[in-house]
């Protein structure tokens, strides 16, 4: 059976890299001042982050059912017998549930994975799916293997301002104003299905240090069950030197890991704003 691996651009994988990896990518749309743009197609990350800094009206969206079905049908009518679709977490978007409903008409030829991943952790799921495909696993077997490790991943997110969380309804206007006055930086966490508040610290440097300390604690826990784990860093920094500095901080904390950096995807950046910084770690059970 020839299995196609499909994901969306929330994984940080875009069309050009997808061709190299052998992955088919559905670009995620974003609504900018009433007009639809597609991540990695007609709107760059630099342009998008600039729009956020200018506080232009931006909303995250999801691919239309027609766009998803068009991709699936083209693959299944060509060289592939079945496919695995790895969208962003169902807890962060309705795109996963939509895909699950659409897949019901394909008699198990389409397997939709819901393992609660986004950004660097979602990328790792795609790479794991490719590895399992090479081992000869079916689409259903790949889906089951990925979902078994759904909760062996965690993401911490630090943000520079509460303004974007206020616009998304995740913090009250009064809370955002007080937080700005006191230079409070929220530390958020994605563990499983939802983006939730974790703690608050004063100042950017303190937030970054606390974030890395929390990740070090998680890393030590993961090491008890696995010798091989994965470190990835993402951010919505507008300047290259800013994301380079953040990656170097993470590399210093985890000198035994080859830390990789990806731009933070549009779907998360819409809610946390520019100059946010994340540290992500996925437990690599599938590597064994």
Language-model features and meaning:
Residues 37, 115-118:
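A short, ordered amphipathic alpha-helix with a cationic face
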Residues 55-90, 94-98, 143, 150:
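Glycine-rich phosphate- or other oxyanion-binding loops that anchor nucleotides, phosphorylated ligands
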């Amino acid at each position: 059976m020839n299995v196609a691996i499909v994901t969306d651009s929330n994984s940080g994988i875009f069309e050009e890299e997808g061709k190299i990896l052998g992955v088919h990518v559905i670009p995620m749309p974003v609504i900018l001042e009433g007009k639809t743009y597609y991540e990695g197609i007609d709107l760059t990350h630099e342009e998008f982050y600039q729009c956020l800094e200018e506080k232009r009206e931006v909303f995250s969206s999801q691919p239309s059912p027609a766009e998803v079905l068009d991709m699936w049908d083209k693959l299944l009518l060509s060289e592939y017998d079945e496919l695995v679709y790895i969208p962003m977490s169902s807890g962060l978007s309705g795109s996963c549930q939509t895909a699950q409903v659409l897949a019901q008409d394909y008699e198990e030829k389409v397997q939709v994975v819901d393992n609660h991943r986004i950004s660097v952790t979602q990328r790792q799921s795609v790479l794991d799916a490719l590895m399992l495909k090479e081992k000869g696993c079916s689409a259903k077997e790949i889906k089951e293997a990925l979902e078994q490790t759904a909760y062996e991943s965690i993401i911490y997110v630090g943000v520079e301002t509460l303004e974007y969380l206020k616009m998304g309804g995740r913090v009250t206007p009064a809370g955002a104003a007080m937080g700005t006055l006191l230079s409070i930086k929220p530390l958020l966490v994605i563990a499983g299905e939802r983006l939730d508040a974790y703690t608050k610290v004063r100042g950017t440097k303190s937030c970054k240090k606390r974030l890395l300390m929390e990740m070090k604690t998680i890393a030590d826990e993961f090491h008890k069950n696995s010798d091989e784990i994965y470190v990835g860093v993402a951010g919505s920094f507008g300047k290259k030197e800013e994301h380079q500095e953040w990656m170097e901080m993470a590399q210093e904390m985890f000198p035994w890991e080859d830390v990789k950096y990806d731009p933070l995807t549009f779907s998360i950046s819409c809610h946390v704003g520019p100059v946010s910084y994340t540290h992500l770690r996925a437990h690599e059970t599938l590597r064994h």
